[in-house]
Amino acid sequence: RVKPHTSFRGRYESGLMKMMAIGLGKQHGAENIHHQSPGIMHELVEEYGRAVMENCPILGGIAIVENAYDETYLVKGLSPEEIITEEPKLRDLSYETIAHLLFDECDVLVVDKIGKNFSGDGMDPNISGRFVQPQYCSGGIDAEKVVILDLSDETHGNAQGIGLAEVTTRRLFNKMKLEMTYPTGVTNTFLHLMKIPMIMDNDREALQLALCCCPDAEDQTNMKMIRIPNTAHIDVIEISEGMLPLAKANPNIEILSEPYELAFDENGNLF
């Protein structure tokens, strides 16, 4: 998949060049690159990728660009020479086709689930705005507080990315497996991805905590909150009434219902 990377910007980001530089090298290749300065990662990906093509029998690669609905938008076969010249063009295309939250900012962003099946970082910072290295990357929504409610089943207890939130739940904490979570952090050196935020007993308390801890909110009585299922599927989202005027003013947003109360169960959870 050719797409924006979660940790750096450059001519080659996530894609074939990075797959040769890191993927084919497996953990050894990943450690070699990640244990050097993050500020030159974009240079290392190209340097390592070119070295692989010069010294290994690479026949070519299949580049896939996805659309905003997590579907295949384009499939293109590339020769080694074309990887060098065409992948940067596909990278530019991916910036146009990927999903975006159609708001610049909110007080609280609620993410139902994170997981490696959604993003290498658990949640895609190009959506959430929570980058591992914000000094090298920007984008996504600007949320004062982020709440993560749960892990996906497919991530098998790997809670990488939990450290990018301020609040989580006991449900997620109980599913977290350190032996699945920590190795990735040791490899990529981004140990703060694995830090554990404040843990609340249920979803209701997690949302309440985040909402009462937003001193920069424009209107403390009408907070701006967005809830998404995960960062890979944001075609249908929930917003608070505080964001309704912004949504109505955007021709690219369709309002699907009248305002309603969040449906917490008897345990205070949303699902």
Question: What are the functions of these language-model segments?
Answer:
Residues 112-113, 128-130:
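Hydrophobic alpha-helical signal-anchor/transmembrane segments
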Residues 129-271:
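C-terminal non-catalytic interaction/assembly regions of soluble proteins
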Residues 119:
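Hard-cation-handling environments
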Residues 31-34, 74-77, 123-125, 160-163, ...:
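Surface-exposed beta-strand edges and their flanking turn/coil or helix-capping segments
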Residues 2-115:
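Conserved, well-structured core segments that form the ligand-binding/active-site neighborhood
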